[in-house]
């Protein structure tokens, strides 16, 4: 793919499709890392349900690693694209060098800081006495593979932002296919159970990591990994812009923890573990929605950033129209899929009739408001692509605040099952605020951007 010139001169509709679709597919495939693990874990004879609940408790760990990768990757990639749009490739190289260093440091510091506290953390995440051993086994091994996961996910942003969406997809596909192959081998053939699932995931992430590093050291991308030029100011700018997606994903952690804790509290000994298992299955389906949706809106950030940096705001406007359309079309399809294919999806995780019926009901509730969620993603990711974290962050925090309020309020009045309605409530009230702010602010931002080169001239 011709990265540099196409971002500034290719037909917008074709360009959006060429970058959005591979990015969406890559994110869909990346979901397989967690979903395939859960599918195979749920089929372990005699202990599938408890093992699945234990692995679900580890969801915040996976999310935590992803949030740190986004802190650097999503913080640095738009800045790199903007600098390329301005024609300043030296500054773009400096941004990538600083981001690579930060990813390396975080990949060592994160597991070192967390591992000593794994037992209280897992208890906080919602592990019961019955599920703790499964959660601890998966948690420990997955965390030891953090360097591979961080580098693979973080560096992939810098592959996609240079226009190489297909190559970014290859990195993800490599790891996902390897995970599908290795999971049954380690879980069943070697008899390692939950530990086998974690080992398969770590090895798969290692493969993706090696691919991403080799690509960014090779001759194909115009901006490659280099040494030197490290700057605290550059790192600060990256972390400032990346803080919005980081805090949002980190809050997803807290959301999972809060939901599991509330379900255990209101479900009690009789229903707590079953409700957590239902939540794990529903969260897996929501990943099938939100990860590809994020691929559409996040992958196309390079188009917005590059043209914004080149002062071509009309191309930015056109691109956003296509991105909004793609997001709405995707969420409409997934709303139908939740109702038509939901029972089949649930059966991948459990053969228990009662649990399957309850999990399907949970999925239907959680997907009631997917359409407005598509608008939320594009508004927030669009503001991030333009370097406007001051707008992106409050809008994201507002949606999370609505979610938290509903998680704690609903079950107090309507029982444990009502907690699942927190998702559609936040998916309506969040986008309403985001669209309102977008309509008010975006035209002013474009006008200010176009006046800047006139003043410089």
For the regions a protein language model found, what residue spans apply to each?
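Helix-terminus/linker motif at the lipid-water interface of multi-pass membrane proteins
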Residues: 28, 32-53, 122-129, 185-191, ...
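Transmembrane helical elements of multi-pass membrane transporters/channels
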Residues: 18-37, 141, 175, 204-208, ...
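Short runs within selected transmembrane alpha-helices of multi-pass transporters and secretion channels
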Residues: 142-160, 171-176, 197-212, 293-297, ...
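Small-residue-rich hydrophobic transmembrane alpha-helices
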Residues: 52-112, 149-168, 276-336, 340-342, ...
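Alpha-helical transmembrane segments of multipass membrane proteins
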Residues: 35-39, 112, 120, 154-158, ...
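N-terminal transmembrane alpha-helices
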Residues: 7-39, 43-47, 60-75, 79, ...
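Residue-level signal for transmembrane alpha-helical positions in Major Facilitator Superfamily
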Residues: 17, 32-33, 72, 113-117, ...
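Short alpha-helical transmembrane segments in multi-pass integral membrane proteins
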Residues: 1-22, 80-147, 189-243, 304-369, ...
């Amino acid at each position: 793919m011709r990265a540099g010139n196409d971002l500034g001169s290719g037909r917008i509709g074709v360009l959006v499709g060429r970058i959005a679709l591979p990015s969406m597919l890559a994110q869909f495939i990346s979901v397989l890392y967690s979903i395939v693990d859960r599918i195979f874990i749920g089929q372990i004879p005699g202990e599938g349900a408890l093992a699945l609940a234990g692995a679900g408790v580890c969801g915040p760990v996976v999310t935590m690693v992803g949030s740190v990768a986004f802190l650097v990757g999503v913080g640095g990639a738009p800045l790199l694209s903007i600098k390329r749009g301005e024609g300043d490739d030296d500054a773009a190289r400096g941004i990538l060098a600083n981001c690579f260093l930060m990813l390396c440091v975080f990949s060592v510091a994160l597991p070192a800081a967390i591992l000593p506290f794994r037992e209280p953390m897992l208890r906080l995440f919602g592990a019961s006495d019955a599920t703790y051993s499964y959660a601890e086994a998966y948690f420990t091994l997955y965390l030891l593979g953090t360097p591979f996961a961080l580098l693979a996910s973080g560096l992939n942003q810098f592959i996609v932002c240079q226009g190489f969406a297909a190559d970014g997809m290859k990195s993800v596909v490599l790891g996902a296919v390897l995970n599908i192959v290795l999971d049954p081998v380690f879980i069943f053939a070697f008899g390692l159970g939950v530990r086998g699932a974690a080992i398969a995931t770590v090895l798969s992430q290692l493969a993706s990591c090696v691919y991403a590093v080799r690509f960014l050291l090779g001759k194909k991308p115009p901006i490659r990994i280099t040494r030197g030029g490290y700057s605290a100011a550059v790192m600060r700018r990256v972390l400032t812009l990346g803080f919005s997606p980081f805090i949002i994903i980190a809050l997803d952690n807290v959301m999972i923890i809060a939901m599991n804790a509330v379900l255990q509290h209101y479900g009690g000994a009789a229903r707590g573990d079953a409700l957590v298992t239902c939540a794990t299955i529903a969260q897996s389906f929501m990943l099938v929605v939100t990860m590809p949706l994020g691929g559409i809106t996040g992958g196309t950030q390079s188009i917005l950033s590059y043209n914004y940096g080149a002062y071509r705001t009309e191309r930015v406007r056109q691109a956003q129209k296509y991105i909004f359309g793609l997001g709405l079309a995707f969420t409409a399809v997934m709303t139908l899929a939740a109702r038509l294919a939901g029972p089949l999806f649930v059966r991948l995780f459990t053969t228990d009739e009662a649990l399957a019926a309850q999990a399907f009901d949970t999925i239907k509730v959680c997907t009631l408001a997917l359409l407005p969620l598509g608008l939320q993603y594009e508004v927030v990711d669009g503001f991030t692509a333009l370097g406007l974290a001051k707008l992106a962050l409050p809008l994201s925090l507002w949606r999370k605040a609505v979610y938290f309020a509903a998680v704690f309020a609903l079950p107090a009045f309507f029982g444990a099952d009502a907690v699942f309605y927190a998702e559609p409530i936040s998916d309506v009230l969040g986008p309403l605020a985001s669209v309102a702010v977008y309509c008010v602010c975006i035209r002013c931002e474009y006008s200010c951007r176009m006046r800047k080169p006139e003043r410089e001239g």
